[in-house]
């Protein structure tokens, strides 16, 4: 138990958040339970939430349940969905501990048993092929077999992932160092997808992956994309384990046309194709193709 608590003290739980004040306290405590207790540090960077949500933050801060808190008023220019990556980056970079646990309040954790998962996950971060330990996907991604009960994914999400803070700093320096150092001027090509696109590019370049536990009724982490009262309803159903089997392990499915959000009907192929087309026609889609091409060119350069 002492070793487990010592590892917990080395973790900073970090999140950028907007809204969802009604369920914030409950789900934050759900995350503590999932981890095995309050971690060494909790960092929350707000994106311009309403006063009711900010009041919840301040109460949690006064109670010692949030350790670092950054607020901006709702009228602040960074209250902008396309620039939320600024808050996400800040949440990670101001963390003080050697390990970062990314979480989102609309992402629901649950476990029965698996009490030693955190120290095992921290040990796995020293593997040469592991970028992070995580999950909470909404669709399939390229994946590979790992040790029994686990798989390796080509994706990593800030809905739920554990990584070394030093890895996060290295990723952002490699992928967007000049942009960050110059003060986030204008709009970045990836917009709000900056961090997760950076993770993907880094994993592809360095041949590392996210290690993910295969979900079963005793271990699930679901990204709901739910808000406010509906998020509270979804949480109650989730903790009661209602209809969870249909939402487990979306990354492992062969159906590339489906997005799964617990508590909502699946987003099927027609919408998926529209989303693909919309993404492909954005600067992010174009830039991601350029990045992938540069990675291929870099690997095949005979002078390297």
Question: Locations of the language-model features?
Answer:
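N-proximal low-complexity "stem/linker" segments adjacent to membrane-targeting elements
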Residues: 1-30
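Active-site acidic short loop of glycosyltransferases
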Residues: 8, 95-98, 127
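Short, acidic, metal-binding catalytic loop of nucleotide-sugar glycosyltransferases
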Residues: 26-40
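Short, aromatic/basic amphipathic alpha-helical patches
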Residues: 28-32, 53-65, 149, 198-203
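Active-site-proximal specificity loops/subdomain of glycosyltransferases
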Residues: 44-96
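Short beta-strand-to-loop acidic/aromatic patch adjacent to the donor-nucleotide binding site
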Residues: 97-108
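Conserved catalytic core of nucleotide-sugar-dependent glycosyltransferases
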Residues: 108-188, 192, 197-201
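C-terminal catalytic/acceptor-binding lobe
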Residues: 174-304
């Amino acid at each position: 138990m002492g070793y487990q608590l010592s590892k917990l003290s080395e973790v900073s739980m970090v999140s950028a958040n907007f809204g969802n004040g009604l369920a914030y306290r409950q789900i934050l405590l759900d995350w503590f339970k999932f981890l095995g207790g309050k971690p060494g540090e909790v960092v929350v960077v707000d994106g311009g939430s309403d006063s009711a949500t900010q009041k919840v933050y301040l109460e949690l801060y006064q109670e010692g349940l949030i350790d670092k808190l950054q607020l901006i008023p709702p009228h602040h220019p960074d209250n902008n969905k396309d620039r939320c990556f600024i808050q996400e980056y800040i949440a990670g970079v101001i963390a003080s501990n050697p390990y970062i646990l990314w979480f989102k309040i609309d992402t629901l954790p649950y476990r029965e048993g698996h009490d030693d998962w955190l120290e095992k996950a921290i040990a796995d971060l020293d593997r040469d092929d592991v970028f992070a330990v995580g999950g909470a996907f909404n669709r399939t991604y390229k994946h590979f077999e790992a040790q029994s009960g686990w798989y390796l994914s080509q994706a990593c999400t800030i809905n739920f992932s554990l990584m070394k803070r030093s890895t996060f700093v290295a990723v952002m320096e490699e992928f967007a160092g000049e942009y960050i150092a110059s003060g986030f001027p204008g709009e970045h090509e990836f917009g709000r997808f900056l961090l997760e696109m950076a993770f993907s590019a880094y994993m592809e370049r360095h041949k590392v992956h996210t290690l993910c536990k295969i979900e079963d009724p005793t271990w699930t982490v679901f990204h709901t994309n739910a808000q406010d009262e509906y998020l509270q309803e979804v949480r109650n159903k989730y903790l009661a384990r209602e209809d969870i089997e249909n939402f487990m392990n979306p990354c492992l499915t062969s159906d590339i046309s489906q997005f799964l959000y617990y508590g909502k009907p699946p987003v099927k192929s027609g919408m998926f194709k529209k989303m693909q087309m919309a993404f492909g026609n954005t600067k992010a889609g174009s830039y991601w193709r350029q990045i992938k091409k540069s990675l291929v060119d870099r690997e095949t350069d005979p002078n390297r």
